């Protein structure tokens, strides 16, 4: 009788182990099917060349370079939106495995270049200032494009592994929180890179070069 009971227990344990292995295998397949994508949606630049030099300073962001031109200002508001879906599987013992898929959209909610009205009668000087602001425009676009390429990689590394939970609602809540945190961290790093690039453009050497070129204008 004891040997029969032991055999039954071993059989039950083997069945449970096989079920666990099958559950974990299905969960790993779920992770392999997860998708992390991002796109950059460009926005046309709005241009305004009718603002007086005296008024341009109020459009300059706090934290801008001390060398920031008062003849032109580039302003942009980056925007990001995320669509998160969580796929789950449940085991007979109540365990839940889950993996998120994520679609990210990077763009700009506003994008404008402001040039001093006083540059109007001086096309050579206006062109030099406009070229400088165009460098800032390029920084915004290039960094956001690169961010759209690289951020899905970072998000997959942080979120693409199978995670186990006690319920579907817990899985959805926790993974949403993790995704929000990871996205905030990546956006912060992207912003730091953008600011550093703008500071380089607004360097003392850059402004000295622009001033020398404007002195050479007719």
Which functions belong to the PLM regions below?
Residues 43, 57-104, 158-218:
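Metalloprotease/metallohydrolase-associated module, dominated by Zn2+-dependent proteases
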Residues 99-122, 126:
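Short acidic, glycine/tyrosine-flanked loop/strand segments centered on an H-E-D-like triad
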Residues 16-19:
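Boundary at the C-terminal end of the N-terminal hydrophobic targeting segment
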Residues 134-151:
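Catalytic Zn2+-binding segment of zinc metalloproteases
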Residues 1-5:
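Bacterial N-terminal signal peptides that target proteins for export
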Residues 6-14:
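Bacterial N-terminal signal peptides
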Residues 21-70:
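Charge-biased, low-complexity intrinsically disordered regions
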Residues 123-135:
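Short alpha-helix carrying the canonical HExxH Zn2+-binding catalytic motif
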């Amino acid at each position: 009788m004891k040997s029969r009971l032991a055999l039954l227990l071993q059989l039950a344990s083997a069945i449970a182990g096989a079920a666990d292995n099958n559950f974990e295998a299905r969960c790993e397949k779920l992770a392999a099917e997860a998708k992390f994508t991002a796109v950059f949606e460009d926005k046309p630049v709005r241009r305004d060349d009718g603002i007086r030099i005296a008024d341009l300073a109020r459009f300059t962001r706090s934290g801008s370079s001390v060398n920031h031109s008062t003849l032109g200002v580039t302003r942009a508001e980056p925007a990001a939106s995320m669509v998160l879906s969580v796929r789950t599987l449940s085991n007979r013992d109540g365990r839940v495995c889950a993996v998120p898929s994520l679609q990210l959209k990077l763009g700009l909610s506003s994008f404008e270049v402001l040039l001093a009205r006083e540059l109007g009668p001086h096309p050579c000087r206006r062109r030099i200032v406009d070229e400088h602001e165009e460098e800032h425009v390029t920084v915004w676009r290039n960094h956001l494009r690169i961010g759209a390429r690289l951020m899905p990689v970072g998000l997959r590394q942080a979120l693409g592994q199978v995670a186990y939970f006690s319920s579907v609602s817990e899985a959805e809540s926790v993974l949403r929180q993790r995704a929000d945190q990871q996205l905030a961290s990546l956006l912060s790093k992207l912003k730091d890179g953008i600011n550093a690039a703008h500071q380089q453009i607004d360097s003392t050497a850059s402004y000295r070069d622009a001033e020398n070129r404007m002195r050479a204008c007719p």
